[in-house]
């Protein structure tokens, strides 16, 4: 039997999604909790391996099991054995041809910047703070150069293990909601650090240090050393994974919890 789960987590105190020796990970905590409910070991496969400090409101995973439990048990029972910063939002049975990663058509991320001279005391680790005034309209305009299928070598981490830097960006929207600037980006997939590297360079445009056309120039140069530093992990959320309709994967509010924009 194959089961898919929707997962939400605060990534602040984890080394990232992927299980690693000697450090705490979201995958490890989830597998340990599921193993209690299954009374046997469980291995999960995720849609997107988030980095250390990165959050998710729409992570999707799957696992195989021979144990027959009500879906409610896989959800509520697992939650009873998880730390408070990880939660299973839903559980459904899926067909054998479903794979959380390889069946996905697209992933969607949001990056949240608190753009105020003073830092926030309420959400210090759920947002990225930038104290210089940013022009979100210029950031949005610059981001449109990244739409479509392109070589994202300029926005790719040096240690990226992907075989190709080519990705197809479906949309990139930068909007302001009072002191919050939200970057919303969807693509078929992302190279390592792609969203945070894009944000870092768009901040240069928003601050006025670089022209809008600089982003187009960076894309064409295909050279990571020419782009801005990587933006902090704290502001990044995996908010949605899109699948073919035949799998009937539940659609949840995109989040993060303090922001429910369209």
From Swiss-Prot:
It is an enzyme of class 5 (isomerase). It comes from the Bacteria. InterPro entries: PsdUridine_synth_cat_dom_sf, PsdUridine_synth_TruA, PsdUridine_synth_TruA_a/b_dom, PsdUridine_synth_TruA_C, TruA/RsuA/RluB/E/F_N. GO terms for molecular function: RNA binding; tRNA pseudouridine(38-40) synthase activity. The keyword Isomerase applies. Keywords: Isomerase, tRNA processing. Gene3D superfamilies: Pseudouridine synthase I, catalytic domain, C-terminal subdomain, Pseudouridine synthase I, catalytic domain, N-terminal subdomain. It catalyses: uridine(38/39/40) in tRNA = pseudouridine(38/39/40) in tRNA. GO terms for biological process: tRNA pseudouridine synthesis. Substrate binds at residue 109. Pfam families: PseudoU_synth_1 (PF01416). The active site is at 51 (nucleophile). Homodimer. HAMAP family: TruA. Belongs to the tRNA pseudouridine synthase TruA family. Formation of pseudouridine at positions 38, 39 and 40 in the anticodon stem and loop of transfer RNAs. This is tRNA pseudouridine synthase A. It comes from Glaesserella parasuis serovar 5 (strain SH0165) (Haemophilus parasuis).
């Amino acid at each position: 039997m194959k089961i898919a789960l929707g997962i939400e987590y605060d990534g602040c105190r984890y080394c990232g999604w992927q299980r690693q020796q000697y450090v705490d990970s979201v995958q490890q905590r989830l597998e340990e909790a599921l193993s209690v409910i299954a009374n046997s070991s469980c291995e999960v496969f995720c849609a997107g391996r988030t980095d250390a400090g990165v959050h998710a409101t729409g992570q999707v995973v799957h696992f195989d099991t021979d144990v027959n439990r009500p879906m409610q048990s896989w959800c509520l029972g697992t939650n009873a054995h998880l730390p408070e910063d990880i939660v299973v939002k839903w559980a459904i049975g899926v067909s054998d041809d479903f794979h959380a990663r390889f069946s996905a058509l697209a992933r969607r991320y949001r990056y949240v910047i608190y753009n105020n001279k003073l830092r926030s005391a309420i959400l210090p680790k759920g947002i990225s703070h930038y104290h210089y005034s940013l022009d979100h309209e210029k950031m949005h305009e610059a981001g449109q150069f990244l739409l479509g299928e392109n070589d994202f070598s300029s926005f790719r981490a040096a240690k990226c293990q992907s075989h190709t830097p080519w990705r197809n960006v479906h949309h990139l929207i930068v909007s302001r909601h009072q002191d919050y600037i939200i970057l919303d980006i969807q693509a078929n997939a992302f190279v390592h650090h792609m969203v945070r590297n894009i944000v870092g360079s768009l901040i240069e445009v928003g601050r006025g240090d670089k022209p809008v056309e600089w982003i187009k120039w960076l894309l064409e140069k295909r050279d990571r050393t020419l782009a801005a530093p990587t933006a902090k992990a704290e502001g990044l959320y995996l908010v949605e994974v899109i699948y073919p309709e035949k799998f009937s994967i539940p659609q949840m509010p995109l989040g993060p919890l303090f922001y429910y924009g369209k």
